[in-house]
Amino acid sequence: MIEIQAYKMDGLGNDFIIIDRRKDKIDLSKQQIINIADRKKGPGCDQIIIIDKDKEKKTNAKITFYNSDGGETGACGNGSRCISYFLMSEKKLNKSKINTESGILKAKLTGKTEVSVDMGIPNFDWKKIYTKNYSEHCQFVGYPQSTNRHI
């Protein structure tokens, strides 16, 4: 069993385990991620968020999101707000940029503990958005995808 320092944050009902690897390199296997996210085996969460240094130094940090099934995924809106607040709080900033699989996301403090994140342009191509039970005959579905698929 390994011991790691982690933080738990909540953003509008989604909860996250945050692991900061900027100082100590911690490699987690897919099974370890699953166990940490499992509410019966570990602290449990919707997603695990890993903080790494941005090697290109264009952003405050490189962020990787993992779903509870252990799979890496794109940026989550609520997770991006939580991690941006975490990063801004430690440096007493009111703006931040995070480098994610979904691109570089800009965040700003809009209140004492409120954060707004520009998630970029949403995907309106419903055939490329993960959905269940849709009809191949449907011509238009009226919803965009602006973040990752949650398991």
Name these PLM-found stretches:
Residues 1, 92, 99-151:
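ATP-dependent small-molecule kinase catalytic core of the GHMP/sugar-kinase superfamily
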